[in-house]
Amino acid sequence: MSYNTNDIMGYAQDPIVFSNEQGGNELYEKVKEVMVHGINENGLPATIFEDTIKSGGMFGTKCPLLMIRHSDSSCRFFMIGIFVYGNQVMFALFGESAENTKYNRKQYYQENGNFIKAALIKPDEFKLQSELQWREDILNVFNNATH
């Protein structure tokens, strides 16, 4: 399944720019090596697979995409998609997060004064914290290797 930039649900962190790297496929291969090694070395619950992401129409840009999802299929977390555009490494979120969606919906209703609807939505705080911790652990693999 090829992804499109329209499939991006947000970003896990800001892009990281490498000024001394060539970028492109060479940088992507280095990122892939760091992530696969780091996730395995740290024993993180993750399944890694490769795909592509496309931007624009029929003649748009296509880039390799490293997808990381939680290895427990009962955990409905966002997937993290890492791709390189030029000399920037991007960390996009794909798919759906059940608890994050509930939390955002509750926040939206509270901010817009609909407190009755907000009171009816009850995200599981433990699951939400678990997802945020998992995401942070995955991102730390890359951040610790590059700093």
Residue ranges and their predicted role:
Residues 1-147:
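A composition-biased, non-transmembrane "mature-region" signal
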